[in-house]
């Protein structure tokens, strides 16, 4: 925009002119409304407004604005064109609204849920290739000096699980498993890099096998262990493989996977056999080797992401499911 942005969301929308479209209303406790803004005569949005509906969501919006500003100040090479730029922070009903540049591309999640997309090796491999290529670009350009322990993948997880589930049975055993996992991860270090923090298919915008945009940076870290992004992509991609399959049925394209208990797709990726688990593990192993970490610790990295999700997920029910999944993966079924 050529003039200073106004102070309110309504004023910003008036200044842009054209059309406005509500893209999504989140169901999370930190729920936000996403609005696309189309200048007159355009077919693609130029701006995205993220509008919080609760005080918790407002803090999330402020955090994302801060992280995007910091990330935007780094020299990240070609990857920088795929990261939204902060245009302004305005106000709506007493809460901050983040205005960002809109990114091109279609959500990888939309393609993921299209007919038989995840049943075909070629399409799944293309998704992993696109995600891996983008992460290699980010982590390579943003690598700092020094070393970051992989144990940082579990920073705060034990305390969070104690607060969240301390009254539930067997949590002491969970914490013991977590301590052992943290100890194993502490043996390995990588150069610290910018970390997205929630690198799942719903946050990737793609076109023709390339990532054109990555959104939702509120969980970003400016100097963290990049292995977390590798793990989050695999666990989140695998989690929904059985979404369109009736309970008890075999999942199309995956002979070793049946739609059974929650998290079956993640168990399949980590402990199952077939082309899909092979792709998932290869994705993590290749990424770890690129970061200078032995590929053999791929399983611990994925376990750490499941535990971290149990500690940090917005929904208590989702967090509990992640914790029970962690128990199964650590042998306590």
Name these PLM-found stretches:
Residues 228-287, 305-317:
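Active-site activation/catalytic loop segments of kinase-like enzymes and analogous catalytic loops
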Residues 36-39, 51, 88, 102, ...:
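Conserved hydrophobic "DFG−1" position in protein kinase catalytic cores
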Residues 24, 32-39, 43, 182-228:
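Active-site acidic catalytic loop and adjacent metal/ATP-binding pocket
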Residues 94-107:
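Conserved short submotifs of the Hanks-type protein kinase catalytic core
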Residues 1-25, 306-333:
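Regulatory N- and C-terminal appendages and interdomain linkers associated
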């Amino acid at each position: 925009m050529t003039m200073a942005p106004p102070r309110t969301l309504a004023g910003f929308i008036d200044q842009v002119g054209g059309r406005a479209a509500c893209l999504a209303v989140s169901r999370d406790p930190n729920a936000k409304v996403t609005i696309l803004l189309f200048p007159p005569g355009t077919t693609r949005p130029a701006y995205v407004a993220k509008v919080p509906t609760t005080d918790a969501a407002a803090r999330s919006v402020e955090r994302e604005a801060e992280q995007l500003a910091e990330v935007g100040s780094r020299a990240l090479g070609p990857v920088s064109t795929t990261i939204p730029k902060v245009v302004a922070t305005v106000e709506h009903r007493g809460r901050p609204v983040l205005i960002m540049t809109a990114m091109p591309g279609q959500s990888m999640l939309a393609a993921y849920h299209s007919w038989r997309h995840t049943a075909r090796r070629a399409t799944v491999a293309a998704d992993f290739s696109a995600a891996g290529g983008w992460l290699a670009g980010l982590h390579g350009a943003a690598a700092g000096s020094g070393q970051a322990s992989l144990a940082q993948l579990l920073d705060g997880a034990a305390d969070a699980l104690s607060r969240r589930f301390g009254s539930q049975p067997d949590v002491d055993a969970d914490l013991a498993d977590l301590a052992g996992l943290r100890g194993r991860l502490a043996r390995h270090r990588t150069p610290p890099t910018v970390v997205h923090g929630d690198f799942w298919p719903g946050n990737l915008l793609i076109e023709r096998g390339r990532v054109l945009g990555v959104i939702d940076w509120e969980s970003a870290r400016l100097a963290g262990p990049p292995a977390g992004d590798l793990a989050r992509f695999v666990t989140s991609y695998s989690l929904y493989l059985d979404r369109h399959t009736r309970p008890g049925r075999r999942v199309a394209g995956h002979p070793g996977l049946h739609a059974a208990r929650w998290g079956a797709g993640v168990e399949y990726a980590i402990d199952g056999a077939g082309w899909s688990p092979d792709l998932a593990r290869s994705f993590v192993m290749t990424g770890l080797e690129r970061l200078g970490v032995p590929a053999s610790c791929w399983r611990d990295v994925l376990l750490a992401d499941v535990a971290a999700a149990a500690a940090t997920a917005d929904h208590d029910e989702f967090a509990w499911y992640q914790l029970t999944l962690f128990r199964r993966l650590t042998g306590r079924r």
